Amino acid sequence: MSQGDIIHFTSQALWLVLVLSMPPVLVAAVVGTLVSLVQALTQIQEQTLGFVIKLIAVVVTLFATASWLGNELHSFAEMTMMKIQGIR
């Protein structure tokens, strides 16, 4: 395994982490912005409200994308193990 292969696998792993973490982060950002807007418009100063709603939205997003996340991680791990096995 050359340095180029290691760099390629590392960049693929980092890209996979970025792509797989994007749905919960985007949902948390959008829901947080909407909750903040509603709180500003209604002058509600409850800080736990935004946290609870964001937490619920992120958990729902993780449940909704769990199959996709698992498939992507499994295929990446399988590909990596096949490449490592081919070194010998």
Swiss-Prot record:
N-terminal signal peptide: none
Transmembrane segments: 15-35, 49-69
GO cellular component: plasma membrane
UniProt record, GO biological process: bacterial-type flagellum assembly; protein secretion
Function field: Component of the Yop secretion machinery.
Family: Belongs to the FliQ/MopD/SpaQ family.
Identification of the protein by name: Yop proteins translocation protein S
